[in-house]
Amino acid sequence: MIQRLLEVGVVKFGDFVLSSGLKSPFYIDLRAVLGHPDLFQWVVSQYLSTLSKLEYDVILGVATGGIPYASVLGYLLQRPFGYVRPEAKGHGAGRQIEGAEVAGKRAVVVDDVLTTGKSVLGAISAVGEAGGRVTAVVVFLDREQCGAEAVRRAGAGVYSVYKMRELLEALRPHIGEGQYRSAVEYLSQWRC
């Protein structure tokens, strides 16, 4: 299935600017998985394996990348589910967290990719302000660009299905030595 991530465009190589503003020689678009039910099912099974080792009361997806995964995981695990917006809505109920009640609860935050941790840290802050506590963050991919360290400093455990170097190693036969070395060299600049 790892090779399928490349085939369907989840993993791309080139020159990209990430939502964090960082430049990168590769891009991970886990949203592309949504159009491939077999791949989506496999990704969900990887999340399930990771979540089975954790204790929590509610599952919260980070908008928008974590929402499809967190909703399916909540359904399959029969756990209350919700999602966290980057900021409260300016209309309606004006909520930042929708769905599951978090006050007094242990939450696991689900996102697709972890880079600097900015969006996940925003979710951790929102849950804390609502009276809950994020005990763990689960992502499919940790890009190994200091996000995990930032989340740990905020008091939550970090669990990833893959780390970027692991994914690159698995894809190495399919991407060529040049792209592999370029990506690994790029990652080597991050000292957390």
Swiss-Prot record:
Highest taxon of the lineage: Archaea
Enzyme Commission number: 2.4.2.10
Catalytic activity: orotidine 5'-phosphate + diphosphate = orotate + 5-phospho-alpha-D-ribose 1-diphosphate
SUPFAM superfamilies named among the record's database cross-references: PRTase-like
Signal peptide: none
Enzyme class: transferase
The keyword Transferase belongs to this UniProt entry's keyword annotation: yes
UniProt subunit comment: Homodimer.
NCBIfam families with a match to the protein in the record: pyrE (TIGR00336)
Protein name, entry field: Orotate phosphoribosyltransferase
Source organism phylogeny: Archaea, Thermoproteota, Thermoprotei, Thermoproteales, Thermoproteaceae
